From Swiss-Prot:
This is UPF0122 protein LSEI_1603. Belongs to the UPF0122 family. InterPro entries: RNA_pol_sigma_r3/r4-like, UPF0122, UPF0122_fam_protein, WH-like_DNA-bd_sf. SUPFAM superfamilies: Sigma3 and sigma4 domains of RNA polymerase sigma factors (SSF88659). Gene3D superfamilies: Winged helix-like DNA-binding domain superfamily/Winged helix DNA-binding domain (1.10.10.10). Might take part in the signal recognition particle (SRP) pathway. This is inferred from the conservation of its genetic proximity to ftsY/ffh. May be a regulatory protein. It holds the Pfam family UPF0122. It comes from Lacticaseibacillus paracasei (strain ATCC 334 / BCRC 17002 / CCUG 31169 / CIP 107868 / KCTC 3260 / NRRL B-441) (Lactobacillus paracasei). Disulfide bonds: none annotated. It comes from the Bacteria.
Amino acid sequence: MEIEKNYRMNSLFEFYGPLLTDKQHAYLALYYGDDYSLGEIATEFNVSRQAVYDNIRRTEASLEEYEKKLHLFANYQAQNEAVDTLVSYARTHYPDDKALSTLLERVADQTAK
């Protein structure tokens, strides 16, 4: 469960990080990106561990709220799944079509960005 939460928070952070304050951005980058503990972040910013905990929880809630309203991450996932399905279908039914294969590689590369 923890791995899924970390993946989700990192993904939401990638999409909505620019909407966060500098402090929120820094705390989440250290906590999720660099795997700092609450105590290490508290020491780094000269605040209490509880202050860091509260800030991170509020920021997580903000990220979830952004996703609830904008759906950028959900749309990204759906788009990637659709492209994967299309690529799989084309490889199965049109394995010798080099032009189609090249086009699908380009589409897959664009959706991965």
